[in-house]
Amino acid sequence: MRILGIDPGTMVVGYGVIEAADDELSLIGFSSLTPPASAPIPQRLAYIYKGLVEVIELYQPDEVAVESPFADKNIKSALAIGKAQAVALLAAANHSLSVTEYSPACIKSRVSGSGTASKEQIQEMVRLLLNLAEIPQPNDAADALAVAICHHSHRAFANITSQGD
């Protein structure tokens, strides 16, 4: 199964694609989309949408996983991220792809075993789980790979628990 993970944002959108075959994970590709910082939000969202459509058409994922915005103290930031998240959902839906959303705490827990893991710990786990020499850069792409790994872990656990029925 090929999984596209997306770390949404209006300044940078990270994406990462993994292939999951049994318990083996392999890296297919990763990068980020960086719309012009001076562009108004609608133009940045259009740039993100077009870029994600190109990513979907290039990598042909089976499923998409997207990080949900975290609204703690900065509601304005969470709302902006939510707009980028909606664009990611739309790009996937327009390609008839199944999309699952995950909270930051769920991603941390699935990737590292701790919902309170640091960004550095998550990035190191991504490196280890994908058997890479270095942590993927930019950070947004490493975060997107963590989203994809989380989705694989979630699906694997769901398959195990459903076999007992």
From Swiss-Prot:
The keyword DNA-binding applies. GO terms for biological process: DNA recombination; DNA repair. InterPro entries: RNaseH-like_sf (IPR012337), RNaseH_sf (IPR036397), X-over_junc_endoDNase_Mg_BS (IPR020563), X-over_junc_endoDNase_RuvC (IPR002176). It is found in: Cytoplasm. Keywords: Cytoplasm, DNA damage, DNA recombination, DNA repair, DNA-binding, Endonuclease, Hydrolase, Magnesium, Metal-binding, Nuclease. Pfam families: RuvC. Gene3D superfamilies: Ribonuclease H-like superfamily/Ribonuclease H. The active site is at D7, E67, D140. Mg(2+) 2 binds at E67. It catalyses: Endonucleolytic cleavage at a junction such as a reciprocal single-stranded crossover between two homologous DNA duplexes (Holliday junction). Mg(2+) 1 binds at D7, D140. Its EC number is 3.1.21.10. GO terms for molecular function: crossover junction DNA endonuclease activity; DNA binding; magnesium ion binding. The keyword DNA-binding applies. Disulfide bonds: none annotated. PANTHER family: CROSSOVER JUNCTION ENDODEOXYRIBONUCLEASE RUVC. NCBIfam families: PRK00039.2-1, ruvC. Belongs to the RuvC family. Homodimer which binds Holliday junction (HJ) DNA. The HJ becomes 2-fold symmetrical on binding to RuvC with unstacked arms; it has a different conformation from HJ DNA in complex with RuvA. In the full resolvosome a probable DNA-RuvA(4)-RuvB(12)-RuvC(2) complex forms which resolves the HJ. This is Crossover junction endodeoxyribonuclease RuvC. It comes from Dehalococcoides mccartyi (strain ATCC BAA-2266 / KCTC 15142 / 195). The lineage of its organism: Bacteria, Bacillati, Chloroflexota, Dehalococcoidia, Dehalococcoidales. The gene is ruvC.
